[in-house]
Design a protein with these regions (language model features):
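Generic enzyme active-site microenvironment
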Residues: 18, 79-81, 89, 122, ...
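Gly/Ser/Thr-enriched, mixed-charge loops and adjacent short helices
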Residues: 1-70
Length: 183
């Protein structure tokens, strides 16, 4: 946390942020991060007892945060899942901004500032194909899980890493998925 704050490139000064910690692992850190970045931070579901993790809370029950943000006139809200490895966002009107949307917005932001190494954004296996198409339109590469079929080869970004993996897969007789790795 200290490193991100020390960069001085992110400021939430004057932004009213709602957090739903799902009574999970983010309960004691999420507020501290946003407070340190200058946000006016409001938190729900930050009282874990070992039994209530994700219980009608967090990213799997986003409706609680939607209502909280709208009723308290907040600018934005973030809902984490119990172990805080997933996050959804809610705008000031209660509209949900999905993880793919967050990744797209931040990927474009980082590209515009020249902060992406090789203009590549890493996605999850759960990312929607629409995200890949949107990144393609912005000339952003995404290392993806490659399936050993000729059809899947056509959707890969044309990068040196993708070409190397493509050659390796097509020259083998493997019929199992081969994960791509960035070098």
């Amino acid at each position: 946390m200290g490193y991100l704050i020390s960069l001085g490139i992110y400021s939430f000064k004057g932004v009213k942020v709602g957090l739903d910690c799902a009574n999970g692992s983010s309960w004691n850190i999420a507020k501290s991060v946003f407070d340190a970045l200058g946000a006016d931070t409001y938190v729900i579901n930050a009282q874990p007892n070992g039994l209530n993790i994700n219980l009608n809370a967090g990213s799997t029950h986003i409706e609680g945060l939607q209502k909280f943000v709208v009723e308290n006139h907040l600018d934005v809200g973030f809902a984490y899942d119990g172990d805080a490895d997933r996050c959804l966002c809610v705008d000031e009107k209660g509209n949900v901004v999905t993880g793919d949307h967050i990744l797209y917005i931040y990927g474009c932001y980082m590209k515009e500032r020249g902060k992406l190494l090789t203009n590549t954004v890493v996605t999850t296996v759960m990312s929607n194909f629409g995200l890949y198409k949107a990144f393609d339109e912005k000339a952003l590469a995404t290392p993806r899980r490659l399936w050993a079929t000729s059809t899947s080869m056509s959707i890969w970004p044309r990068t040196a890493a993708a070409s190397a993996v493509s050659r390796a897969v097509t020259s083998s007789s493997a019929s199992t998925p081969v994960p791509a790795t960035a070098s």
